Design a protein with these regions (language model features):
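Flexible, polar/low-complexity N-terminal or interdomain linker segments that lie immediately upstream
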Residues: 2-52, 58-60
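Sec-exported extracytoplasmic/periplasmic mature domains
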Residues: 47, 51, 66, 88, ...
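N-terminal, post-signal-peptide region of Sec/Tat-exported proteins
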Residues: 47-83
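Solvent-exposed coil/turn segments that connect beta secondary-structure elements
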Residues: 58, 75, 98-100, 135
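Catalytic cysteine-centered active loop of the rhodanese-like fold, especially the PTP/DSP P-loop
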Residues: 84-130
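Active-site-adjacent betaalpha module
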Residues: 138
Length: 138
């Protein structure tokens, strides 16, 4: 058994390394200057008429979204000017993407804070958890 231990240990390490890589790609729980909200808290903001910005890829947006969400793909469309056309810096705004494994909404929230937006909400759980909760989608 001891002769096979190094090979077994190496196999286990190699087998678990993809899991470590996935864990490292988790979105942050908070964004400085923004408020992290749960799907339940986001629903209250939705019901209050707050602007939701979907920063996912166009194909994700086309496949399903929160009703009325504005699509500003973070890779091509999210600029200070484009966001300013959708929401004023003093007004609340919610950013979302594809949940914990997606960095787009945390990056967008940080960008908005940097541009002077004072009421930024970060829906870390994103569209998947919103949909799973049975909240409105289109």
């Amino acid at each position: 058994m001891t002769r096979h231990f190094p090979a077994l240990a190496a196999a286990l390490c190699l087998g678990l390394s993809p899991l470590a890589a996935v864990a490292a790609e988790q979105s942050p729980e908070t964004v400085e200057g923004a408020t992290t909200v749960s799907p339940e808290e986001a629903l209250a903001l939705f019901d209050a008429g707050v602007v939701f910005v979907d920063v996912r890829k166009p194909s994700d947006f086309d496949a399903g979204r929160i009703p009325g969400a504005v699509h500003l793909d973070i890779k091509t469309d999210l600029t200070e000017a484009n966001l300013g056309e959708v929401v004023a810096t003093a007004d609340p705004v919610v950013f979302y993407c594809n949940g914990h494994s997606c960095m787009r909404s945390s990056e967008a929230s940080a960008m908005a804070v940097g541009w002077g937006y004072s009421e930024v909400y970060y829906l870390r759980d994103g569209y998947p958890d919103w949909e799973a909760a049975g909240y409105p989608i289109e």
